Amino acid sequence: MTSVWSEAIQHKDLKQWIQEVAELVTPKDIRICNGSDSEYVEIYGLMQQSGVAIPLNRDVHPNCFLVRSSPEDVARVEQFTFICTKEQKDAGPTNNWRDPEEMRQELHGLFRGCMRGRTLYVVPFCMGPLNSPFSLIGVEITDSPYVVCSMKIMTRMGEEVLKALGTSGSFHKCLHSVGVPLAPGEKDLAWPCNPQHMRIVHFQDDSSVMSFGSGYGGNALLGKKCVALRLASYIARSQGWLAEHMLIIGVTNPEGQKKYFAASFPSACGKTNLAMLKPKIPGWKVECVGDDIAWIRPGPDGRLYAVNPEFGFFGVAPGTSATTNPNALATCTSNSIFTNVALTPDGDVWWEGLTSQPPEGLIDWQGKPWKPGGAPAAHPNSRFTTPVQQCPVLDPQWNSPEGVPIEAMIFGGRRSETIPLVYEALSWQHGVTIGASMSSATTAASVGEQGKLRHDPFAMLPFCGYNMAHYFDHWLSFASNTSLKLPKIYGVNWFRKDKNGNFIWPGFSDNLRVLEWIFRRTNGEESIAKKTPIGYLPEESALNLEGLNLSTQALQDLLSVDVPGWLKEVANVREYCKIFGSDLPQAITDELFRIENELKIIK
């Protein structure tokens, strides 16, 4: 089996690893992926022949296809996601911990013979611009052609990565299988998966990933959450940088001044919408560097610089429309993969929110005729996978090896009460406390109950690869480096509701009005803010509200300090932080006491 494929691999350790894996999983053949367009077309063709991929109408969506997953494999599975470290305390209370050696033994049992009857694909990939100091190279071994096609879109993948790796470069070993071996002559499932034995496992001792049983996005595209966040956050701590669940945008004002912001929101809370925002206010421009992950390093001038390590967008489809995100729709017009959306009779895609009325004759995400009034036609976590270069508002510096300088960091969540529209941290320590205090109503991006409020510090709860309290400490440590020019930190909340349960703020493109205030604050405008215990809030006259029909009461709700609500908030955060015990940094404890004491004074 070795002689045919090994000619493409010059790296001795990589060649040896592929051979070891092949002996364990016993595939029918091995293919080294070169990342070419012709390879993509060929593998997509194989998926089409087997019934996995449904080609879409070429007049509407050229070179696009639809894939339907198993109903048992539709989202991230946090309960089956593990961090393996030598000591349990290094994983911390927010991660599922397992002993690395015990877990390796268990996984070797699961992987033994698991690719029988399937092709083993070797997918070399790079997270971050090639030959950038930011970048990490990985190699994913998988038996899923869907993963190969998705990795072609989501990462820099193939021959150019092998060339950059050379004969001795370091790489992250990422092993994936759907976990369904095939007997000779056995017909394959449309979406093979093994939900009873799902495992997504991160080994921090050798910076590797093993994923078994799921073919869904974040569980199977191992460059994304697994390498770019769970492994990278662990590496970043030891090397003095940050790997964050953040979008990156460039914002230009009417005078031509440009600033870059990074913003952190839990999954399905509007990151992609903000990253591709189409301003209503004349003269302003927002350009997208990335919509999901940011790697942030101190630059030679003391500023923090960020890159988007990804090469594509993996966006939530429901709710995306010409009104909410026209740029996202334009991005995924061609060369894209749609997963678990509905299909129209003329070969187009549809999902809830795309149009006000569903077209007739829809086939739902499970391949069944759909009738209005029942279950959604598209799964709530249905996705589009699309190349970043197709984004009409892509920032010119999106692929810069040095990254872009960040002047503001923004933290937000889905909160119906208490949290104001926007507020600025009083200090870096306070800003870290804002990030650590984040909570949000849960969404369909992960398996579990939706709409329940859960704490999600820095929107990293599912993605931090080590003890979250140590992660807070790492953030705080940046303030002790006096050579750094740290960005200002902000909290935002687009999701406040009135007493009737209606959203107060229009959101979407109108969020630029908040970005405009942040922009002015980073320019040092003092008079547009008032100091409060929770941070600097906008003066009501400082927000550009032209064209909005906001009542005085609505504006007051958005921009005032709800003292009883905030006292409850502080108590709630303090109670949550008990899970970290003595590992919780004293600075966060002190900041919570400061906020509480100052609130009691104005009460």
Curated annotation (Swiss-Prot):
<dbReference type="InterPro" id="IPR018091">
    <property type="entry name" value="PEP_carboxykin_GTP_CS"/>
</dbReference>
<dbReference type="GO" id="GO:0030145">
    <property type="term" value="F:manganese ion binding"/>
</dbReference>
<feature type="binding site">
    <location>
        <position position="225"/>
    </location>
    <ligand>
        <name>Mn(2+)</name>
    </ligand>
</feature>
<dbReference type="Pfam" id="PF17297">
    <property type="entry name" value="PEPCK_N"/>
</dbReference>
<feature type="binding site">
    <location>
        <begin position="268"/>
        <end position="273"/>
    </location>
    <ligand>
        <name>GTP</name>
    </ligand>
</feature>
<dbReference type="GO" id="GO:0006094">
    <property type="term" value="P:gluconeogenesis"/>
</dbReference>
<comment type="function">
    <text>Catalyzes the conversion of oxaloacetate (OAA) to phosphoenolpyruvate (PEP), the rate-limiting step in the metabolic pathway that produces glucose from lactate and other precursors derived from the citric acid cycle.</text>
</comment>
<feature type="binding site">
    <location>
        <position position="245"/>
    </location>
    <ligand>
        <name>Mn(2+)</name>
    </ligand>
</feature>
<dbReference type="GO" id="GO:0042594">
    <property type="term" value="P:response to starvation"/>
</dbReference>
<dbReference type="GO" id="GO:0006107">
    <property type="term" value="P:oxaloacetate metabolic process"/>
</dbReference>
<keyword id="KW-0479">Metal-binding</keyword>
<dbReference type="GO" id="GO:0071333">
    <property type="term" value="P:cellular response to glucose stimulus"/>
</dbReference>
<feature type="binding site">
    <location>
        <position position="292"/>
    </location>
    <ligand>
        <name>Mn(2+)</name>
    </ligand>
</feature>
<dbReference type="GO" id="GO:0046327">
    <property type="term" value="P:glycerol biosynthetic process from pyruvate"/>
</dbReference>
<dbReference type="GO" id="GO:0019543">
    <property type="term" value="P:propionate catabolic process"/>
</dbReference>
<feature type="binding site">
    <location>
        <begin position="381"/>
        <end position="383"/>
    </location>
    <ligand>
        <name>substrate</name>
    </ligand>
</feature>
<dbReference type="InterPro" id="IPR035077">
    <property type="entry name" value="PEP_carboxykinase_GTP_C"/>
</dbReference>
<dbReference type="GO" id="GO:0005829">
    <property type="term" value="C:cytosol"/>
</dbReference>
<comment type="subunit">
    <text>Monomer.</text>
</comment>
<keyword id="KW-0963">Cytoplasm</keyword>
<dbReference type="InterPro" id="IPR008210">
    <property type="entry name" value="PEP_carboxykinase_N"/>
</dbReference>
<dbReference type="GO" id="GO:0004613">
    <property type="term" value="F:phosphoenolpyruvate carboxykinase (GTP) activity"/>
</dbReference>
<keyword id="KW-0464">Manganese</keyword>
<feature type="binding site">
    <location>
        <position position="267"/>
    </location>
    <ligand>
        <name>substrate</name>
    </ligand>
</feature>
<dbReference type="GO" id="GO:0033993">
    <property type="term" value="P:response to lipid"/>
</dbReference>
<keyword id="KW-0547">Nucleotide-binding</keyword>
<comment type="similarity">
    <text>Belongs to the phosphoenolpyruvate carboxykinase [GTP] family.</text>
</comment>
<dbReference type="InterPro" id="IPR013035">
    <property type="entry name" value="PEP_carboxykinase_C"/>
</dbReference>
<feature type="binding site">
    <location>
        <begin position="508"/>
        <end position="511"/>
    </location>
    <ligand>
        <name>GTP</name>
    </ligand>
</feature>
<comment type="pathway">
    <text>Carbohydrate biosynthesis; gluconeogenesis.</text>
</comment>
<protein>
    <recommendedName>
        <fullName>Phosphoenolpyruvate carboxykinase [GTP]</fullName>
        <ecNumber>4.1.1.32</ecNumber>
    </recommendedName>
</protein>
<feature type="binding site">
    <location>
        <begin position="216"/>
        <end position="218"/>
    </location>
    <ligand>
        <name>substrate</name>
    </ligand>
</feature>
<dbReference type="InterPro" id="IPR035078">
    <property type="entry name" value="PEP_carboxykinase_GTP_N"/>
</dbReference>
<feature type="active site">
    <location>
        <position position="269"/>
    </location>
</feature>
<dbReference type="Pfam" id="PF00821">
    <property type="entry name" value="PEPCK_GTP"/>
</dbReference>
<keyword id="KW-0456">Lyase</keyword>
<keyword id="KW-0210">Decarboxylase</keyword>
<keyword id="KW-0312">Gluconeogenesis</keyword>
<keyword id="KW-0342">GTP-binding</keyword>
<feature type="binding site">
    <location>
        <position position="76"/>
    </location>
    <ligand>
        <name>substrate</name>
    </ligand>
</feature>
<feature type="binding site">
    <location>
        <position position="414"/>
    </location>
    <ligand>
        <name>GTP</name>
    </ligand>
</feature>
<dbReference type="InterPro" id="IPR008209">
    <property type="entry name" value="PEP_carboxykinase_GTP"/>
</dbReference>
